[in-house]
């Protein structure tokens, strides 16, 4: 068995608490740098499966002490404003502790062939698994390829472990997204450059 694995989950957040004034406290799911979170729009999933747009807020700089301005914000000091003024209003909209939250981002195709969006790690891997399976359909192979769309990769590779323990593959090939480092590394240290593959 050759397992072709890609994960379907993405980094995000989860409702931790709804304050009396309706602001939502949250925790991270997957790897986040807290300096990248404030001022982003997010989508809060409600109990009926619809989404409410919110924006991540933090203490304004003119209210911060000098030490607060010189350090990354703690996740506990960030909140999501969904445009309500009470906990009851938030609950009436279907917001509950434990509800998932994802970044709000539009998929955009640029004129130069660049695609902008979210969760390419690892939706592109999922697309690659499908492409490989389509390409080998009907071929006589000496191995049994099995496509796997795993979950919970962003929180510890859990889905891939379950799949591997279930399928017991001889070989596993993981289709995984990786960040391009040409935006922050010097030319002699770049390993993954946008548009050049690996």
Positions of predicted regions on the chain:
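N-terminal hydrophobic/helix-forming segments and targeting peptides
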Residues: 1-198
């Amino acid at each position: 068995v050759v397992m072709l694995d890609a994960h379907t989950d993405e980094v995000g957040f989860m409702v931790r608490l709804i304050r009396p004034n309706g602001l939502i406290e949250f925790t991270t799911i997957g790897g986040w740098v807290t300096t990248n979170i404030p001022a982003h729009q997010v989508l809060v999933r409600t109990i009926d499966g619809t989404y409410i747009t919110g924006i991540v807020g933090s203490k304004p700089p003119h209210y911060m002490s000098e030490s607060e301005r010189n350090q990354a914000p703690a996740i506990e000091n960030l909140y999501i404003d969904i445009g309500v003024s009470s906990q009851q209003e938030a609950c009436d909209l279907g917001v509950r502790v434990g509800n998932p939250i994802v970044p709000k981002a539009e998929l955009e195709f640029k004129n130069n062939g660049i695609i902008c969006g979210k969760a390419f790690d690892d939706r592109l891997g999922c697309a690659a698994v499908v492409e490989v399976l389509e390409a080998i359909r009907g071929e006589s192979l000496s191995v049994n390829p099995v496509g796997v769309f795993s979950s919970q990769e962003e929180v510890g590779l859990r889905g891939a472990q379950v799949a591997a323990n279930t399928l017991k593959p001889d070989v596993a090939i993981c289709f995984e997204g990786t960040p391009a480092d040409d935006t922050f590394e010097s030319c002699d240290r770049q390993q993954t450059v946008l548009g050049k593959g690996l």
